[in-house]
Amino acid sequence: MSTTTGPEAAPKPSAKSIYEQRKRYSTVVMADVSQYHVNHLVTFCLGEEDGVHTVEDASRKLAVMDSQGRVWAQEMLLRVSPSQVTLLDPVSKEELESYPLDAIVRCDAVMPRGRSRSLLLLVCQEPERAQPDVHFFQGLLLGAELIREDIQGALQNYRSGRGERRAAALRATQEELRRGASPAAETPPLQRRPSVRLVINTVEPSAVRGRPQVESIPETEEARKPDQARTTSSADPTSPDLGPRGPELAGLQAERDVDILNHVFDDVESFVSRLQKSAEATRVLEHRERGRRTRRRAAGEGLLTLRAKPPTEAEYTDVLQKIKYAFSLLARLRGNIANPSSPELLHFLFGPLQMIVNTSGGPEFAKSVRRPHLTLEAVTLLRDNVTPGENELWTSLGDSWTCPGVELPPEEGSPYSPEFYNGWEPPATDPQGRPWEDPVEKQLQHEKRRRQQSAPQVAVNGQQDPELETESQLEEKARKWVLCNYDFQARNGSELSVKHRDVLEVLDDRRKWWKVRDHQGQEGYVPYNILTPHPGPQVHRSQSPARHLETSTPPPPPAPAPAPTQVRPQWDSCDSLNSLDPSEKEKFSQMLCVNEELQSRLAQGRSGPSRVTPGPRAQEPQLSPRSEASVVRAWLQTKGFSSGTVEALGVLTGAQLFSLQKEELRAVCPEEGARVYSQVTVQRALLEDREKVSELEAVMEKQKKKVEGETKTEVI
């Protein structure tokens, strides 16, 4: 994909603008005043900047900054008069800086490394400053050589009174304008180079039946399954993406969406670069203010003041909207981009987002940015991939950032459409002349339709169709219930606060955070590792709390329940842990341990400490309050805890370990304390169940002996 310029780059000049430029030159040349549109790139103070002691050092540092994307070009007017060189604001014509000709030490055109066109170099020495300033400019309509000749001609005229060189330079300038040459149209201006655009690529097309194919963008979760990832032939005719138009058009759409994503990243990087330059300029101004002895403005402060001006509120809103838009685009293109992938680019966006939130005064401003809404896929991508630090930032931004658009009230006004700094617009129509839809808005509409289609159908008179009632009864049998083992406090609108011993209905258990519904009908996400299977509420189980309808007549008395059929419980069902036999209970405990281990590794990342591989489950020590320290140590090693955790807790007895609370374990083992507490809780539950079984067996044995005794008495 091609690299495009950023917001500071000047667009290709139109014929009218070139005409106006020529007209301005023709009117000012007679007064020995010329004016040029330039981009100011950077200013170095020799001796003050790190490693910048000569002009050559400044040129090398500029090349390094450009390769790192740290150059922020700022458009302005450079005016040359018989006595001075002045820098003006291009809009207000306000004077930013003024350099007398006797203060200009050097004027030259330099060729930075990796560029095909030269830059204008000005070295200015103010009488009040010990070291000179080095300025780099880039000509927009004329090359740096012509501007250099004009300034050097003015210097010669100022010092010797000879004006032939400047007159020749002005004639050359007019001749160049007549030819309509434009450096900006021939070569990209020196500026920030996007670091992401060069590596975002669509996935390699696969050859099917000798014909190159492009992966289409899936609209549903099922479309992302591995066996369907490369399906490129005819799709569902009702699909809002492909329909009968074929995979070739889908490939073009994917490329268009990737191009939009690249431009979004360009603008985000430009905004962050502007924030960094603004902060640097502010620090320099504050440093100069502290060391100033007079009230006279020092050299270069006009440029610094302009550069230190922070972005406006509208600009902050615009970049936050683009970040939200990028989240949805990344989720949509998850199967179409690689090197880097969507999750990797997701982490890349959180750095700028953190900086923007900090510089805008905290998360309150970002909370007010409601549009565009996030797609359901974007929320899923975020929830499944953010790190703990990123999750803290993400959840602090409120419901408009953590809830999908289908769960938020609709916003008034036209749909959001990004406007890019450099004026680029995506193609409006496809090769067949049909208008392209905005990819994020289309995905939001698709999710809304899917939500409406999945809603329960009710007749006009309020009575449900008998066939639908039968389906609901079948659905009721397949519903899944869980028991909450710990309190959990929601941190955002998408999560649900639950209490210990709450019985919850599971709505979605495909990821690490399960979507559940409580007895009040409230829905939200909770972590899966605080839940255990449960048979569900014993009263009115045939109706969900959210769907329960009161009737005017009391229900008839229930019929005698048939004898329960002994069926082996399935591990994906809602059977209670208490109803399992010891071997199955052990299997569930093992599954829970594996899930917790996976969660710990995912949260810790690749750089986390390695763990001891757990030994065979059959040889696992049985931990109880009566266990000695050696048994506790062996149990910790078997569970795969790190050596630090084993050394810290391996000196405790079973009773001491069982008495510790989660906060105390976290204080001793910050990284693994919570997991130790979870494992101890599971072990405690297993012990309690075994004791209940033993008590039940004792009662049954006593009852059996009593019955046998009564039988013997009757026989006698």
Swiss-Prot record:
PROSITE patterns: SH3. SUPFAM superfamilies: PH domain-like, SH3-domain. Residues 453-464 have a biased composition (Polar residues). The keyword Coiled coil applies. Signal peptide: none annotated. Keywords: Coiled coil, Cytoplasm, Phosphoprotein, SH3 domain. InterPro entries: EPS8-like, EPS8_2nd, EPS8_PTB, Eps8_SH3, PH-like_dom_sf, PTB, PTB/PI_dom, SAM/pointed_sf. Detected in placenta, skin, mammary gland, bone marrow and stomach. Residues 477-536 form the SH3 domain. The modification Phosphothreonine is found at residue 187. Residues 682-713 form a coiled coil. The modification Phosphoserine is found at residue 182. GO terms for biological process: Rac protein signal transduction. Residues 553-563 have a biased composition (Pro residues). Residues 175-194, 203-249, 404-472, 528-582, 600-628 are annotated as: Disordered. Belongs to the EPS8 family. Interacts with ABI1. Part of a complex that contains SOS1, ABI1 and EPS8L2. Associates with F-actin. This is Epidermal growth factor receptor kinase substrate 8-like protein 1. It comes from Mus musculus (Mouse). The gene is Eps8l1.
